[in-house]
A protein has these predicted regions:
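Active-site cofactor/cluster-binding pocket
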Residues: 1-189
Length: 189
């Protein structure tokens, strides 16, 4: 299996942890994996994105334009910003959520419905994940990363076994947050 995955969002959404969980799950399955993260001003609400490349013959962790199989978007505006990296037949799974990154707020912001419409018009395969009800059910919005990871896994878009992802969660999430994160991961089963 060869898979190129980009995760994108804003600081504080758990994008980096989700990237590390995907990489750990791939390694548990014996697959070669390389990843790179750009976190910039993440702690201040800036843009965050991760590139993950799984499979043989990968020489660099960076994914070229038009080469991503999957774009996992934690925030609509950032998802649109990373869309040029998606293959023509690639898949987008994005949270139906807009969080104004600091960089966007400096320029006056954007309309989330316009971002959603743009994705609908330009992505060959698009799944918009409605996360607000899940936040209410689970009692926390801090599990966005595991909700999206679970939705991507349930759809088969990651190409990894759910058991490998669950094992990666158990190995990488602190014990006091483990139960909530596993519930979030399994929410869309």
């Amino acid at each position: 299996m060869n898979k190129n995955i980009i995760l994108c969002g804003v600081g504080g959404q758990g994008t980096v942890l989700a990237s590390r969980l995907i990489s750990a799950a791939a390694m548990k399955e014996g697959l070669p994996v390389q990843s790179a993260e750009t976190i910039g001003m993440a702690q201040r609400g800036g843009s965050v994105f991760s590139h993950i490349r799984i499979g043989e013959g990968v020489n660099t962790p960076m994914i070229g334009l038009g080469q991503a199989d999957l774009l996992l978007g934690f925030e609509l505006g950032e998802t649109v910003r990373q869309l040029p990296y998606l293959k023509k037949d690639g898949r987008v799974i994005a949270a139906e959520r807009a969080v104004m990154p600091v960089t966007a707020s400096l320029g006056g912001g954007y309309d989330p419905s316009v971002m959603k419409q743009y994705l609908q018009e330009h992505a060959a395969a698009l799944t918009i994940v409605k996360v607000e009800k899940a936040f209410e059910t689970l009692g926390s919005a801090k599990v966005l990363n595991l909700l999206l990871l679970g939705a991507a896994s349930a759809s088969g878009a990651l190409g990894l076994q759910r058991s490998s992802l669950l094992a990666a969660i158990e190995d990488n999430v602190p014990p006091k947050f483990l139960d909530l994160n596993k519930k979030a991961f399994c929410y869309f089963e």
